[in-house]
């Protein structure tokens, strides 16, 4: 099965100068886990996900896991979330983006998602995003084909 058979062609994207607040609202409202970041020529320059949205709220999360007892006032830290609302996506987006083509096998897309710990991949053809393929759509297609679910 090819990526083109599963990809969603209704691609919601953002630009590098989209604000944190706007991208968070967009992902939440449309109930998607991420979106490609496109430049003015509609080329993929990054990807922003729910994980990136949460991670910027907790820039200290790695040190927290090393020494959780040193973080006593979590509410005060969370109250500073408003300070980042105008931060541009280009500051916290992922830059080294893995993409697939419409002709790639879905098993390749699935393997790339697992290897890179992502749940969605932009589908690119001739340098332009033509769709998004999700781990969920691959999972469902494989179960349906192999187990009749």
Spans of model-derived segments:
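Bateman/CBS regulatory modules and CBS-like beta-alpha motifs in cytosolic regions of diverse proteins
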Residues: 1-32, 37-40, 44-45, 68-112, ...
């Amino acid at each position: 099965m090819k990526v083109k058979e599963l990809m969603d062609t209704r691609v919601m994207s953002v630009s590098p100068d989209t604000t944190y607040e706007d991208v968070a609202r967009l992902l939440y409202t449309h109930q998607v886990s991420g979106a490609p970041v496109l430049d003015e020529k509609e080329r993929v320059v990054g990807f922003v996900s729910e994980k990136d949205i949460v991670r910027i709220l907790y820039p200290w999360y790695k040190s927290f896991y090393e020494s959780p007892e040193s973080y006593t006032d979590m509410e005060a830290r969370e109250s500073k979330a408003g300070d980042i609302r105008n931060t541009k996506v280009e500051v916290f987006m992922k830059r080294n983006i893995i993409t697939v083509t419409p002709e790639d096998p879905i098993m390749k897309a699935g393997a790339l998602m697992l290897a890179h710990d992502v749940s969605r991949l932009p589908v690119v053809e001739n340098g332009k995003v033509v769709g998004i393929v999700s781990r969920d759509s691959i999972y469902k297609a494989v179960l349906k084909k192999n187990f009749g679910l």
